[in-house]
C-alpha cells in the first residue's frame, strides 16, 4: 500500500512541483518560406514543399549537423526561439488551418533534432505507427517533421494515401492518433527538425492535468518512458 501511495505521488504530485515553463533561447531568427507549396492534405496530415526559408534551413544545418554526427544521439532537445514565437506559430497555423500553440513544458517531445545515418538501427520508425497523443479529446496534437539536411533515399508512406519521397526542407504535419504512417530509408543521412504543437494554449502548471484526460495522462507517462528508453537503446545499438 505504501508503495502504491509513493507511486501515485510520483505520477501526479511531482510533475506539479517540478513544472517550469521552458525558455526557448536559441535565436536563429528563422521564418517560414512565403513561397511554400502545400501539395497534399488529408484527414490528419498536411504536406508542404520548401517550408522554411533557405537562410533558416542553412542556419539549422550549420548549428546542429556536425554535433549530431559526433554524438549520434537519436534525439537532441533544442530550445529554439522560433518554436514559441507568435509570428512563426501564426505562419504554421495558416498552413494547417487552425491555431497552433507549443505543448506543455513537461512534455519531453517538444522541439528536437533527430539524426539518421546510413546503416543505423531504427526498426520502429520503419513500421506503421501513430504518433502518441498526450492530450484529451478536445485538444488536437500535431507533429511537424522537417528534413533540414537530407542526402537519403527516404520514402514516406501515409496509410491509404500512398508513398512519396521525403525530401530536404519538406514539412509534414501529422495529427497524433489520426495518421498511420511509416518512414523508410536505406542510404544517405538525414537531420530532422521535429516539433510538437497543440491547438489550445496549455503551457502552465494546471494545464498539465486539465488539458489531458486519463488516457492522455497515461500516454504522457508512456511517452516519458519511451523517450528515455529509446534514446538509450539507439545509443547502444548504433555505437
Positions of PLM-derived features:
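Non-heme Fe(II)/2-oxoglutarate
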Residues: 23-105
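A broadly conserved detector of short glycine/acidic/proline-rich loop/turn motifs that flank catalytic sites
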Residues: 51-52, 132, 178, 197
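Hydrophobic beta-strand residues in large extracellular and virion-surface proteins
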Residues: 48, 60, 88, 92, ...
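Generic beta-sheet signal
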Residues: 3, 44-46, 172
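Conserved double-stranded beta-helix
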Residues: 70-155
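Catalytic core of Fe(II)/2-oxoglutarate
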Residues: 140, 151-239
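A general structural signal for short secondary-structure junctions and capping/turn motifs
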Residues: 37-39, 104, 133-137, 163-165, ...
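Fe(II)/2-oxoglutarate
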Residues: 1-42, 206-239
Amino acid at each position: 500500500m505504501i508503495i502504491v501511495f509513493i507511486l501515485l505521488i510520483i505520477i501526479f504530485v511531482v510533475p506539479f512541483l517540478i513544472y517550469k515553463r521552458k525558455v526557448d533561447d536559441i535565436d536563429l531568427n528563422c521564418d517560414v518560406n512565403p513561397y511554400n507549396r502545400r501539395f497534399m492534405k488529408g484527414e490528419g496530415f498536411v504536406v508542404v514543399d520548401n517550408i522554411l526559408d533557405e537562410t533558416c534551413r542553412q542556419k539549422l544545418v550549420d548549428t546542429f549537423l556536425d554535433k549530431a554526427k559526433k554524438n549520434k544521439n537519436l534525439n537532441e532537445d533544442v530550445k529554439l526561439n522560433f518554436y514559441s514565437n507568435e509570428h512563426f506559430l501564426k505562419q504554421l497555423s495558416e498552413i494547417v488551418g487552425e491555431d497552433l500553440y507549443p505543448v506543455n513544458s513537461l512534455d519531453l517531445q517538444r522541439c528536437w533534432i533527430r539524426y539518421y545515418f546510413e546503416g543505423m538501427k531504427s526498426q520502429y520508425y520503419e513500421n506503421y505507427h501513430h504518433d502518441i497523443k498526450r492530450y484529451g479529446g478536445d485538444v488536437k496534437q500535431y507533429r511537424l517533421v522537417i528534413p533540414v539536411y537530407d542526402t537519403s533515399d527516404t520514402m514516406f508512406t501515409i496509410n491509404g494515401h500512398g508513398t512519396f519521397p521525403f525530401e530536404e526542407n519538406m514539412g509534414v504535419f501529422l495529427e497524433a492518433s489520426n495518421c498511420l504512417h511509416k518512414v523508410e530509408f536505406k542510404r544517405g543521412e538525414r537531420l530532422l527538425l521535429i516539433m510538437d504543437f497543440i491547438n489550445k494554449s496549455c503551457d502552465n502548471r494546471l494545464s498539465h492535468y486539465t488539458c489531458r484526460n486519463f488516457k492522455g495522462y497515461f500516454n504522457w507517462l508512456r511517452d516519458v518512458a519511451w523517450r528515455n528508453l529509446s534514446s538509450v537503446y539507439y545509443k547502444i545499438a548504433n555505437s
